[in-house]
UniProtKB/Swiss-Prot annotation:
PANTHER family tied to this protein: KXDL MOTIF-CONTAINING PROTEIN 1
Source species, domain of life: Eukaryota
Protein's name in the database: KxDL motif-containing protein LO9-177
InterPro entries linked: KXD1-like, KxDL_dom
Pfam families associated with the record: KxDL (PF10241)
Recorded family membership: Belongs to the KXD1 family.
An MF annotation (GO) of this entry: protein homodimerization activity
Provenance organism: Oryza sativa subsp. japonica
Any one GO biological process: lysosome localization
Protein role: Contributes, together with ILI5/BUL1 and BC1, to the promotion of leaf inclination and grain size by modulating cell elongation.
Subunit structure: Homodimer. Component of a nuclear cell elongation controlling complex made of ILI5/BUL1, LO9-177 and BC1. Binds directly to ILI5/BUL1, ILI4/BU1, BUL2 and BUL3. Binds to BC1 in the nucleus. Interacts with BCL1.
Primary location class: nucleus
Keyword line: Cytoplasm, Nucleus
Length: 123
């Protein structure tokens, strides 16, 4: 029941001709022109985004070293301040133990350390 090759080719040509008759060639040209215009715009957008990414990468490289050094500086300052406040607390407690009358009642508890605890989460 299979058709011979010439009949199949003729049937395929007929189907193709009917499909071509359904669509206007002017419409196909307009679609291709619109697609070409869109392709150009997408390529321009891609070029702009690529340039922006390269610029952002360069800016990040410049800033990241500075940011890392500032972070290290802040961490060392925090460690230094923690050490200083630890020494101050121990000095205050030794003073309070040696000279209990030097501080009024309750004043020592208020002045021991009024800094907020930065390690605990905020409520």
């Amino acid at each position: 029941m299979e058709k011979s090759p010439p009949e199949t080719a003729a049937a395929a040509a007929e189907v193709a001709a009917r499909f071509r008759s359904l669509v206007d060639t002017g419409d196909i040209g307009a679609i291709r022109q619109t697609q070409h215009l869109i392709l150009g715009r997408l390529q321009d957008s891609n070029a702009v985004l690529t340039h922006f990414n390269e610029y952002s990468e360069q800016c990040f490289a410049e800033v990241s070293n500075d940011f890392a050094s500032k972070t290290r500086l802040l961490k060392s300052m925090k460690d230094d301040l923690d050490h200083i406040f630890l020494k101050l607390r121990s000095m205050k407690s030794r003073l309070a133990a040696t000279y209990p009358d030097a501080f009024p009642d309750g004043a020592m508890a208020k002045t021991m350390d009024q800094r907020p605890d930065l390690e605990s989460p905020l409520d």
